[in-house]
From Swiss-Prot:
PROSITE patterns, A to Z: KRAB, ZINC_FINGER_C2H2_1, ZINC_FINGER_C2H2_2
Gene name, Swiss-Prot/TrEMBL: ZNF564
Molecular function GO labels: DNA-binding transcription factor activity; RNA polymerase II cis-regulatory region sequence-specific DNA binding; zinc ion binding
Name of the protein in its database record: Zinc finger protein 564
Ranges for domain KRAB: 4-83
CC per GO annotation: nucleus
Function: May be involved in transcriptional regulation.
Homology family: Belongs to the krueppel C2H2-type zinc-finger protein family.
Annotated InterPro entries: KRAB, KRAB_dom_sf, Znf_C2H2_sf, Znf_C2H2_type
């Protein structure tokens, strides 16, 4: 089968023919040619979208060359005036002046619209072919960093900036920097709202129909690209391709810490910050810092309340429509993502992915201080506070720090003895809702995870694994000082205080300190004149002191 070249499928118009087309026909021509080029790409022709656009612009330049010839032969400008304005309707290069002065090749007489086009043409006489509009397979400019090839020097230089981080084009409105002039122009539409394609839902404007079409899907919920591996769907082909890297691991940018791969250096750099802790985007109002500009923008909306997408229930603003849809599920209770293992449902895909690691045992996030591994990044960040003590919520009794107020509030109850959650079956009380839910499984026997030895049920796989150690006798936590081994990480932490002498619990009334929260609580009750624990057995009532062996529970 003969190879197919772009000129074999291209439809070229003369000046007179083009002038007879109405705007809708011209638009149809553009759409058909773009689709034709993409079909060629599917059967073996490979080129960048930029090359398609360059070829298309070249067709416009050919038409303009015809126009120039018509102008040079005609004494009356108005004979070609209407055709001229219609050709400019192509919007291929808005900066082309009304009177174009063509550049002529001195070797063959061929005429070009730009000096750069003439320079490329002259190289063809000299035997150099750095770029040829007719040979789309040729990409002589290869990136040394990632191996990606380009057909034009301009595209290659623009790509190199993704590696160097150079962003020479800054937005005069907000200061955000970009690697190319087209990028900053597209960004400026956010400020001016002057794009030719405007969303009827939110008013956001775009300079290209493809971007506008993708954006519309954020409102309609349409996701035409579905992953055959996990059935997750996406609104755009680039999003789908980035997702596939998770399955194949074939991205050109691979993290040395965790092995995760990425298709773009910008995403790779942001990911690296999750390991280094770097947060270059800082909020001037509250001092909170972020690893990415997108996260920073989302945060700023909390201060300004000025996001483009607002929750219809509570009015909270968001930067993306996907964020507001996710948030609205907190009001509706909708949980569309289901775990294939246990049937548990979640409101977001990220939450179900994190949950699935409790089944697989995967813990990709490791603490650099002690080596402990975690299933999610927030988990390892919360854990790091134990080492750094830098959490925003600090306990006044023992000095322990926390990253969120709910965790801090639960911890405070270990000092005050408050247990607001009481079991209606046996009367036992708990400091948190999570603990009473775990306890209720003892009564109902209805937990999703059951011990294979005794049938006891649990609410999460980590709990059943810990319980199974009571049958196997496994004690994976060993004290480095004395060699004593323990079933639980919490048990060894409490035991280590016998070596260090640490007593984190201090009585505010007399200053006495304690190693264990249970000892501290008993002491506080002595000040208050409260009796420790009263148990009723039939008609008998008696006081009991909890055994030290249970202090870690």
């Amino acid at each position: 089968m003969d190879s197919v070249a772009s000129e074999d499928v291209a439809v070229n118009f003369t000046l007179e023919e083009w002038a007879l087309l109405d705007p809708s026909q011209k638009k149809l021509y553009r759409d058909v040619m773009r689709e034709t080029f993409r079909n060629l790409a599917c059967v073996g022709k490979k080129w960048e979208d930029q090359s398609i656009e360059d070829w298309y612009k070249n067709q416009g330049r050919i038409l303009r060359n015809h126009m120039e010839e018509g102008l040079s032969e005609s004494k009356e400008y108005d004979q070609c005036g209407e055709a001229f304005s219609q050709i400019l309707n192509l919007n291929l290069n808005k900066k082309i002046p009304t009177i174009v002065r063509p550049c002529e090749c001195s070797l063959c007489g061929k005429v070009f619209m730009h000096h750069s086009s003439l320079s490329r043409h002259i190289r063809s006489h000299l035997g150099h072919k750095p770029y040829d509009y007719q040979e789309y397979g040729e990409k002589p400019y290869k990136c040394k960093q990632c191996g990606k090839a380009f057909s034009s020097c301009q595209s290659f230089r623009r790509h190199e900036r993704t590696h160097t981080g150079e962003k020479p084009y800054a937005c005069p409105e907000c200061g955000k920097a970009f690697i190319s002039l087209p990028s900053v122009r597209r960004h400026m539409i956010k400020h001016t709202g002057d794009g030719p394609y405007k969303c009827q839902e939110c008013g956001k404007a775009f300079d290209r129909p493809s971007l506008f079409q993708i954006h519309e899907r954020t409102h309609t919920g349409e996701k035409p690209y579905e992953c055959q591996e996990c059935a997750k769907a996406f609104i755009s082909l680039p999003s789908f391709q980035r997702h596939m890297i998770r399955h194949t691991g074939d991205g050109p940018y691979k993290c040395q810490e965790c092995g995760k791969a990425f298709d773009r250096p910008s995403l790779f750099r942001i990911h690296e910050r999750t390991h280094t802790g770097e947060k270059p985007h800082e909020c001037k109002q509250c001092g909170k810092a972020f690893i990415s500009f997108t996260n920073f923008q989302s945060h700023m909306i909390r201060h300004t309340g000025d996001g483009p997408y607002k929750c219809k229930v509570c009015g909270r603003a968001f930067i993306f429509p996907s964020y507001v849809r996710k948030h609205e599920r907190t009001h509706t209770g909708e949980k569309p993502y289901e775990c294939n293992k246990c049937g548990k449902t979640f409101s977001s895909s990220s939450n179900v992915r994190t949950h699935e690691r409790t089944h697989t045992g995967e813990k990709p996030y490791e603490c650099k201080e002690c080596g402990k591994a975690f299933i999610s990044l927030p988990s390892v960040r919360r854990h790091m506070i134990k080492h750094t003590g830098d959490g925003p919520y600090k306990c006044q009794v023992c000095g322990r720090a926390f990253d969120c107020p709910s965790s801090f509030q639960i911890h405070e109850r270990t000092h005050t003895g408050e247990k607001p959650y009481e079991c209606q079956v046996c009367g036992k009380a708990f400091i948190s809702l999570k603990r009473i839910r775990k306890h209720m499984i003892l009564h109902t026997g209805d937990g999703p995870y059951k011990c294979q030895v005794c049938g006891k049920a649990f609410d999460c796989p980590s709990s059943v694994r810990t319980h199974e150690r009571t049958h196997t006798g496994e004690k994976p936590y060993e004290c480095k000082e004395c060699g004593k081994a323990f079933n639980y990480a919490s048990s060894i932490r409490i035991h280590e205080r016998t070596h260090t002498g640490e007593k984190p619990y201090e009585c505010k009334q007399c200053g006495k300190t304690f190693s264990y929260s249970s000892s501290f609580q008993r002491h506080e009750r002595a000040h208050n004149g409260d009796k420790p624990y009263v148990k009723n057995v039939g008609k008998l009532s008696f006081i009991t002191q909890p055994s030290n062996t249970c202090e870690n529970e």
